[in-house]
């Protein structure tokens, strides 16, 4: 007597649906790579950007003492259990996601308070493209700690478009902002600190360095350095 075999039918429709969605599931980084040339050309069409410097900003000793206070639209938080003092804009200018792009600023340990005094007008500026940043409380770190000898400032960059993308205007403002930070420190003859092994920077950046924290680690390596130098965001900052 013949054995009846069950009728097994592969549902190809579901596979087709998944397959059709694959081109749309590009990561934010891949989208930025695909749009690199367009953004590169658009950025160069913008004139130089001039940032309005904030007045009546706190000095370094002030923010080391505060627990939580509002300054120039930024909430400053200094928890006793944290080595960092955090600043976050109450009404963010960039409504998109954080996709890992950030900058460090490395200063000689003894000059961190002075560096903050020099940069605070820009960091608190209403024109600043940076909605969130932090600075090391030097009273809470050891002499040779990573964020004691360098990387005392961290600037977090958020996207401003759908799909975690950056507009050309925001990228232009960030480029100009970094240039202003660098030039102010250089003009004031601030001594640079030791920039992190996890980061990359071009030769003309003396204080600022870049890292994408979602695609790298703190230890750094030759392979990681090469990968970071190929990041489209970083290239749009320096090329």
From Swiss-Prot:
InterPro entries: OspF/SpvC, OspF/SpvC_sf. The active site is at 104 (proton donor), 134 (proton acceptor). GO terms for cellular component: extracellular region. It is found in: Secreted. The keyword Cell cycle does not apply. Its EC number is 4.2.3.-. GO terms for molecular function: lyase activity. Keywords: Lyase, Plasmid, Secreted, Virulence. Pfam families: VRP3. Its main location: secreted. The keyword Secreted applies. NCBIfam families: PRK15245.1 (NF011781). Belongs to the phosphothreonine lyase family. Catalyzes the removal of the phosphate group from the phosphothreonine in the mitogen-activated protein kinases such as MAPK2/ERK2, MAPK3/ERK1, MAPK8 and MAPK14 in an irreversible reaction, thus preventing the downstream phosphorylation of histone H3. This epigenetic modification results in inhibition of the transcription of a specific subset of pro-inflammatory genes, and ultimately to a reduced immune response against the invading pathogen. The diminished immune response enhances the bacterium's ability to disseminate and multiply within the host. This is Phosphothreonine lyase OspF. The gene is ospF.
């Amino acid at each position: 007597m013949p054995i009846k075999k069950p009728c097994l039918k592969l549902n190809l429709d579901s596979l087709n649906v998944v397959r059709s969605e694959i081109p749309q599931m590009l990561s934010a980084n891949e989208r930025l790579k695909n749009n690199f040339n367009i953004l590169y050309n658009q950025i160069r069409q913008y004139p130089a950007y001039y940032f309005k410097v904030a007045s009546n900003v706190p000095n370094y000793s002030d923010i080391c003492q505060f627990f939580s206070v509002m300054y120039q639209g930024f909430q400053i938080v200094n928890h006793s259990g944290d080595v960092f003092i955090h600043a976050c804009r109450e009404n963010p200018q960039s409504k998109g996601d954080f996709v890992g792009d950030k900058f460090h600023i490395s200063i000689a340990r003894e000059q961190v308070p002075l560096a903050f005094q020099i940069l605070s007008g820009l960091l608190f500026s209403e024109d600043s493209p940076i909605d969130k940043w932090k600075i090391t409380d030097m009273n809470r770190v050891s002499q040779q700690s990573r964020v004691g000898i360098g990387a005392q400032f961290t600037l977090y960059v958020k996207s401003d478009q759908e799909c975690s993308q950056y507009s050309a205007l925001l990228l232009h403002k960030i480029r100009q902002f970094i240039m202003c930070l660098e030039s102010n420190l250089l003009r004031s003859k601030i001594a640079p600190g030791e920039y992190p092994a996890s980061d990359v920077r071009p030769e003309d950046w003396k204080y600022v360095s870049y890292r994408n924290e979602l695609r790298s680690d703190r230890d750094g390596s030759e392979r990681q350095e090469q990968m970071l130098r190929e990041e489209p965001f970083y290239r749009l900052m320096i090329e």
